[in-house]
Each structure stands twice: as C-alpha cells, then as structure tokens.
C-alpha cells in the first residue's frame, strides 16, 4: 500500500507506476487458482466401493457388533464420474469387474447402491446407475482442443482418503501400445494418480471432463506414482457412452 494517499485513492497515473514484477506475479497467482474448475467438476466425482458382510467374532474387540449380527465392511474400489442427472456414472471396467455388490458415495456424503448398466471391455469403460436425485453431471470437454503442456486436474479418491484434487500438465497425447486395452489413445499426465483414482475425472481449467483416469506407469510394480499417468480421452468416451446409455452393444468394424 506504499504510495497511497490517506483517503486510499490512487492518482490517475498510478497504473503506469505499478511494478511490472507485481503484475507478473499477480497473473501467475490467478493462473494457479484452480478453485473455479474444481467447484464445477468435483460434485460429479464419486467414490465406488463394495459392501461385504462378515460375522463378528466375540474374541475380537475391534469392530465387534455386540448384537452378534453380521457386520458390514466397506472396501473402496475406485472412483467414477456422474455423466447424467438420471444417475448414470462412468468408471473403468477394471474397477467393477467381478464385483456384484456395488455402492457409490457422492461428494455430498450421500451413499447409494449401484448396479452395472453396461460395459465396454475393449476401452475399459463401464456404466453404473444409482437411483438418486439432485445429481450434478460432468460437462464433457472437446479432446480435439487438447495440447501438450496444458494444465489439467485429476479428481478422485486415492487410497480411500476422500475426494482429492491434484494438478499437472498434459505430458503427451495419443499414447498407445501398452496392452492395457484393445483401443488405446491415452492422455499422459503428470498430475498425481494413485490407487483409488481409477475411474475418476481428468478435467481442464474450465472444469470440463477431458478424460477418465485409468492407469499409471510403475517400473518397479509397487503402484507408486512416478509422474506418468494415463487417462482415457473424452473422444473415446464420446464414441462409447451413447451406446452404453442406450443399452446397446458397442459395434466396431474389423478388417479381414
């Protein structure tokens, strides 16, 4: 506030005397504030878990149900993204593969039982459905506008600690040949993606969904994040989601 008059009014030519470094730092600060994008996208990101019943043991004082009834335990599986206000949730197929008892926890704390509505194994995408009202659906972004170096945010539930946001950049586009899916066109990012983030959202700074976080590269197979994560781009989502919503099989052409 140096140089201000007592009344707090700047002289007319004050803008010409502002330190350029101050203006540069202010611009950087604005670019680093991702709260607007997070506020738009975070309500659409959910936690996917399974409920498992286990009989209580009277000899174990930890978690015993003293009524002797089976106790319900929850195991986090991954994350998902609400894609319609009617309760449709997109996630990775590998997150829910073989799980019959699925539940979803919304960002507002509500939980619902979920059912598998459709799947596309070849792109590792699956569609769940919950019966819930007041849902916020993600807005799908345009993958054709993505560029290497753009800032992106990953939202999910790593290690079941609760909804978490990490920031990074698009490190590469069109990554393939990993043998993870039959159809690969991954966005590579250095935004931290850890166990539990699978099925969660990769968003741009407008809060639009540009990818579904799917896998990480871990050279020592410890599942520790080393700065190389992969997301299924919105272009593939655009191709697969309409069929899943309509309950149709995904039809693809083959050469031969």
Please give the residue ranges for each predicted region:
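Serine-dependent protease modules
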Residues: 2-256
